[in-house]
Every structure is written in structure tokens, then in C-alpha cells.
Amino acid sequence: MEQPRKAVVVTGFGPFGEHTVNASWIAVQELEKLGLGDSVDLHVYEIPVEYQTVQRLIPALWEKHSPQLVVHVGVSGMATTVTLEKCGHNKGYKGLDNCRFCPGSQCCVEDGPESIDSIIDMDAVCKRVTTLGLDVSVTISQDAGRYLCDFTYYTSLYQSHGRSAFVHVPPLGKPYNADQLGRALRAIIEEMLDLLEQSEGKINYCHKH
């Protein structure tokens, strides 16, 4: 019997500040060209750097696609590696977005937990991708920056009960080009899907015995 295709949603961000071309969206477009194989329906979206749009769009994406996984990709001017974020944070949002707006509460979800971890083992993903010998360094972080990246990640983790991931990429050419970033994203997401499948297999096995 043919396995049902999995839906995977991957988002990048639009321009903001000095990032007139956002490396995250360029990387996601490269990933779209490469695809994630015949068993995955890949849906990509560019997200504006706007708090209120994020609060509206993230739940809508989960409702529309019922995805196996959502991966958000953002650019960090400080990054020199491709960075896997372990968690999103609820509070501390003071930076203005592209609409010159900032949440009055400075938080994602009032009365929500301080932080939410992804259910994906980012250390395992990092180790597995590193062994593939890609020409891209992959590292781990626990601080997505308290701006739209972190805000988006927390919103998605809250919506999905942890079934989301966030990947920070450096600006284009510092040091990686679009093709390298796209291939790194593909390898990372394939490992994430594999780990999710393994963990679900264990859960199903436990339920049967």
C-alpha cells in the first residue's frame, strides 16, 4: 500500500532593515527547487516581518496544511553557521517591526509558558547533518533573538505543541551562497523528518503492547 504523502511547510522572511534581500527567503526558494522527495508535499511561504501578520498567519498555515512539520528559516547578521534553534521565548519583544509596531505586552502569548522547546532533538539533527560532509557548518542555539524570528518560532511551537523547527542562516555570501544554504536546509529537514518518524514509530509500538 502506498504511503500517504507528508505535508511540510517551510517559511522564510521578507526584507527588513539592512537585509533588503533576505537570505532566509532565498534559501527557502532554493530548497523549493530541490524538493524533499516524492513522499513530501512541500509548501513554502514568505512571511513579512510584522508581528500581527505572524500571529494571524502561523495558525492559518497549520489549519490549512495539517503538516507533519513546519520549519521557519530566518537570517541573522551575527551568524556564520547554519544554526538550529532549540526553543522559542514568550517575552522580551521590544524591537519595532516593518510597520513600526511592537506588541504592547511585549510577549507572544499572554500567560503562555516562558519558553517552549521543539520536540525535535536538535543536537541529534546537528550531529547527523555534520556527518554528511556538506560544505556548511551546522551549530545549535537556545536564543533565537527576541525579534520576529523568535516571535514566529514561539507562536508556531505554541500552535503545534512543539512540532516546529527554526533555522537561522547567515547573510548571503557570509560565507555561504544560495545553493549551499538550500542544500543544507534540505539535509536538515530530511533528518528532522526521519527523527520524527522514528519517535512516532516508538510511540505506536508502545501503544500496541
Swiss-Prot record:
Q: What does this protein do?
A: Removes 5-oxoproline from various penultimate amino acid residues except L-proline.
Active-site residues are: E85, C149, H168
Question: Domain of life here?
Answer: Eukaryota
Q: What class of enzyme is it?
A: hydrolase
Where located? Cytoplasm
Q: What does the record list as GO biological process?
A: protein catabolic process; proteolysis
A Pfam family matched in the record:
Peptidase_C15
Q: What gene makes this protein?
A: PGPEP1
Protein name (record) = Pyroglutamyl-peptidase 1
Q: What is the protein's species of origin?
A: Homo sapiens (Human)
